[in-house]
Design a protein with these regions (language model features):
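Predominantly extracellular beta-rich ligand-binding scaffolds that present long acidic/polar faces
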Residues: 9-143
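Extracellular beta-sheet-rich ligand-binding/adhesion modules
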Residues: 1-15, 186-192
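Surface beta-loop-beta hairpin patches that serve as ligand-binding interfaces in beta-rich domains
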Residues: 141-143, 147-192
């Protein structure tokens, strides 16, 4: 998006050649989404999430980029790119809240709140096995529902939680990060 006001909720945006989501200025809310960059055909694939307050030489104030209760992951050790102009007076406002991120851990940023960072040394995280039901790079088959080991389970904040997941299933009292709520039996709407 360029200088737009957008809201992305309960969405899965995955495996694109370019950035899965790219925000150039404006206002954006990414709420309870799964952004996963496992695009297999080009090592120069984009980021899972790119946000900036400029494009080329043109300043585009980033009024807000809120990533809430979301998963942002992929093959690379860092699938999130925040690019800002050198001029500190230019607006560049972002927040990551109760999200699962594949990026180097940040400890001194007040805009990163209650976030879980994936271990970039863990090969199961790189392949998606840590989080998802199926990431089969050989056959190009993917299922981005959460598996039982995912650190995304029960880590969303109620404050920004949506009542239903992308499949239309009711989220429980301890909602999960990402667009899919984990259920032990995927055909059942109740956790066992």
């Amino acid at each position: 998006s360029e200088n737009c006001s957008i809201e992305i909720r309960n969405s899965q945006i995955t495996n694109t050649l370019n950035d899965c989501v790219a925000i150039f200025g404006g206002s954006a809310i990414i709420q309870q989404c799964t952004l996963a960059q496992f695009y297999p055909f080009d090592s120069n694939r984009g980021a899972a999430l790119y946000y900036s307050n400029f494009q080329g030489e043109r300043y585009m104030p980033l009024l807000k980029m809120d990533c809430l209760n979301s998963i942002v992951t992929g093959y690379a050790n860092d699938v999130i790119t925040g690019a800002k102009m050198d001029d500190e007076t230019k607006e560049f406002n972002y927040r990551f809240v109760n999200s699962l991120l594949r990026t180097p851990e940040v400890t001194d940023d007040e805009n990163i709140i209650n976030v879980t960072f994936e271990n970039v040394e863990d090969t199961s995280a790189v392949s998606g096995e840590e989080n998802f039901v199926l990431v089969d790079i050989d056959k190009q088959r993917y299922d981005f529902h959460l598996n039982e080991k995912s650190p995304a389970i029960n880590t969303a904040t109620i404050e920004y939680s949506l009542p239903e997941d992308r499949d239309g299933r009711q989220r429980d009292e301890l909602p999960d990060v990402g667009c899919y709520e984990y259920f032990k039996d995927p055909t059942n709407n109740e956790n066992e």
